[in-house]
Amino acid sequence: MIQEMWTQWVLNIRASCLGALAATPFIWCFIFKSLFTFSIFTSLQISIFYWAVLGAHVTILCYCYITFTKEWSYYIEALGIACLFLTMLTFFISHLMWAPLYTLPFVFVLNCICLSLWVPITYDIVYLCPFITYKYYELGFLNAMLLYYVMVANRMYLSVIFMCPFVLFLGMGVFALKNFHEHPVFENILITCKPIFTAKNKYKTKGTEVNMKLVVHNLGAVLFLLAVEFASVVSVVQRLDIFVGMQNYLFLLFVSMLCCCMFSLPSNAICVVLETFAVVIIIVIHVLIDKLPISIIGGLLVIVILLMCQAIGCQIEIIRTKLAGDVGGPKLCLFLCTVCNIVVSVALTCCNKSEQL
């Protein structure tokens, strides 16, 4: 019993490290969006750093069409070293006054593309594990993001230790990923999955058509809830500049579906309750929008977004449960989470009149 508990605990710790590793592309975007979007740069540079988080999400969507076979594990260390090198190179270039004008944005984008690979690679394996394990993954992701929120808020970007956690996330994440495949719990999960392992290091899945038939109603529910969320956010943000000076601190909402759904359960009832609460708050906001302080309205809207993300998360959990026997299941869930993040990011960024470029 003790041995089993220790084995599960080790798996959960590794999942937390993988969550921190998956957060690195978004931390990378957050750092540059917070610190480098000033008037001393050209408008093109500002635009690149400002919209980088959307670019990272689109890159992840493209990666969802790649099958990460066992052969990828042989290149994990090389990818980690490449990301570390590009990280150091980027900050070295940022301190060079004589560097060509677009060198910094180019290296920044290149590193963002490389870092984005960690999201589908880690997501594919962690979400085949037990429920508690991938919740630790989300917790690790959230803690990594919050750590840099605190560091930026306290102006620790002037400190020599500012990039130390980022490098630590890379190192610990790569080490955990390298050893995750060999964990006995994960090996047993692969054996019990319905797909079989072939000689070419590829898993056979049930197929897209079969998967769609299983979850078609849940996909419709996700799209409906997403449309409601988009309409709710736009209807409020267009009326008031409620996010003046707060754009950097709303960055967590841009990745909310990857780290803020820890309380989502595979339950339609919970989904309905969460969405109902969110809609009621939206109605209250519109009724009292001229009477409440802007700060309170902004706080209520953040609560609405989080509640609606939890509701969508419930539907995605149901999809994940229905596709539990398919190795391709996590890929579909990641695709849906990324699409939801893109919609929220577009709504908050394009409608935020106070900080449009």
Swiss-Prot record:
Read off the InterPro entries from this record: Herpes_BMRF2
Q: Which domain of life is it from?
A: Viruses
- Please report a single Pfam family linked to this protein: Herpes_BMRF2
What family is reported?
Answer: Belongs to the herpesviridae BMRF2 family.
What is the designated name of this protein? Gene 58 protein
Species this chain originates from: Saimiriine herpesvirus 2 (strain 11) (SaHV-2)
